[in-house]
Amino acid sequence: MKNKFLICDECQAVNLKSLKRKLEKLDPEAEIEIGCQSYCGPGRRKTFAFVNNRPLAALTEEELMEKVTKQLKKPRDPEEEERLRKRNEERKRRKEEQDRKLKEKLKKHKAEK
């Protein structure tokens, strides 16, 4: 089973270019998905990546890469990964819904002025 990395292109603490390069070097065969991961709270203070749907975060990229390396050495449980994938998708869906409602509210507020 191929490894999968999810990394954010919007969070302040994530350096997309260097993190992507390091992950590609660690596992050239892995699938890398770039985009908002709806992990904004931790992403303001820590660099992070989702490794096979499991969130890993650290204060520095070096620390994160150590955690990623350890995670990749652990045996994988397909059922657990599926559960985590569903949880991540639900988190993203809720964030998109919140963003949509906020945009509607702002639009309505501007129309009232």
Swiss-Prot record:
Query: Where is the stretch described as Disordered?
Result: 68-113
Q: Where is the signal peptide?
A: none
Coiled-coil regions, chain positions: 78-113
Compositionally skewed regions (Basic residues) per UniProt: 103-113
Q: Which InterPro entries match?
A: DUF1450, UPF0741
Highest rank taxon of the organism: Bacteria
Which keywords are on file for this protein? Coiled coil
Q: What is this protein called?
A: UPF0741 protein SERP0241
What organism is this sequence from?
A: Staphylococcus epidermidis (strain ATCC 35984 / DSM 28319 / BCRC 17069 / CCUG 31568 / BM 3577 / RP62A)
